[in-house]
């Protein structure tokens, strides 16, 4: 690795064809770069993240979710079949959830699966199988997986997921601590949030929209913290004023 070199600093913007690095790097395959010999080139316009002699390219916009085994996703039921459900996971490929995985038993002949999951329902699941030759197969075996029964689902471009989470979960921790909401960020660009009030929920949505639009800006975590404190401070003041007016 001593002869390897990365030509961009952390959080620099790269464009298609840029020579990113040269040498021997043990990094996972990604559609966002290509390799010629021992040289790595960017295939998109994005942000490069450098850490401990490794790099990752995060697209700035566009791009659908590329399934990866083990990822947690939030899928939307778009079809009910005899032995399972077809889900939209914001990918070029629809995903399939076998009923046996959801029910924990084989499907009975003539059983109506709409009793359990119907069109428009959201499901938290993991990508169990995917190899580019078949559509992703989902599983809900595991803690916290299954049908979404409460909260709101917020859609963002999948490429913005790393920014919403932040380095060492810094952005996600800020969103959680400042709002008190329970927040799950799925890898396919859907966020499940359970908040105490509608006003807090709306403030969270606004904060996420800011992150989405300004994901390339440094100091964004602190900006979001200040925004939420000001926004929720205004909300609390408005609530107090209304309470005083009614007494």
Swiss-Prot record:
Gene name per UniProt: rrp4
Gene Ontology molecular function: poly(A) binding
Protein's name according to its UniProt entry: Exosome complex component Rrp4
Residue ranges of every copy of the S1 motif domain listed in the record: 70-143
Cellular component GO terms held in the UniProt record: cytoplasm; exosome (RNase complex)
Domain of life: Archaea
Compartment(s) of residence: Cytoplasm
Complexes and interactors: Component of the archaeal exosome complex. Forms a trimer of Rrp4 and/or Csl4 subunits. The trimer associates with a hexameric ring-like arrangement composed of 3 Rrp41-Rrp42 heterodimers.
Function: Non-catalytic component of the exosome, which is a complex involved in RNA degradation. Increases the RNA binding and the efficiency of RNA degradation. Confers strong poly(A) specificity to the exosome.
Record family assignment: Belongs to the RRP4 family.
Entries under PANTHER family matching the protein: EXOSOME COMPLEX COMPONENT RRP4, PNAS-3 RELATED
Keyword annotations from UniProtKB, A to Z: Cytoplasm, Exosome, RNA-binding
GO biological process: CUT catabolic process; exonucleolytic trimming to generate mature 3'-end of 5.8S rRNA from tricistronic rRNA transcript (SSU-rRNA, 5.8S rRNA, LSU-rRNA); poly(A)-dependent snoRNA 3'-end processing; RNA catabolic process; U4 snRNA 3'-end processing
Domain KH: 149-211
A Pfam match: ECR1_N_2
SMART domains documented for this protein: KH, S1
């Amino acid at each position: 690795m001593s002869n390897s070199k990365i030509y961009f600093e952390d959080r620099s913007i790269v464009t298609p064809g840029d020579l990113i690095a040269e040498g021997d790097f043990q990094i996972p395959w990604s559609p966002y770069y290509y390799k010629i010999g021992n040289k790595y080139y960017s295939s998109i316009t994005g942000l490069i993240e450098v850490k401990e002699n490794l790099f990752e390219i995060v697209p700035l916009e566009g791009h659908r979710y590329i399934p990866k085994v083990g990822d947690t996703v939030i899928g939307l039921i778009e079809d009910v079949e005899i032995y399972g459900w077809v889900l939209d996971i914001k990918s070029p490929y629809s995903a399939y959830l076998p009923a046996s995985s959801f029910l924990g038993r084989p499907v009975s002949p003539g059983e109506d699966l709409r009793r359990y999951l119907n069109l428009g329902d959201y499901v938290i699941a993991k990508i169990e199988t995917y190899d580019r030759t078949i559509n992703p197969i989902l599983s809900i075996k595991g803690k916290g997986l299954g049908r979404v029964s409460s909260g709101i689902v917020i859609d963002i471009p999948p490429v913005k997921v790393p920014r919403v989470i932040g380095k060492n979960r810094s952005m996600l921790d800020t969103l959680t601590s400042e709002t008190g909401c329970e927040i799950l960020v799925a890898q396919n660009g859907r966020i499940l949030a359970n908040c105490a009030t509608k006003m807090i929920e709306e403030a969270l949505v606004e904060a996420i929209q800011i992150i989405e639009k300004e994901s390339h800006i440094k100091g964004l975590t602190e900006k979001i913290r200040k925004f939420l404190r000001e926004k929720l401070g205004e909300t609390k003041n408005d609530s107090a004023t209304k309470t005083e007016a009614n007494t």
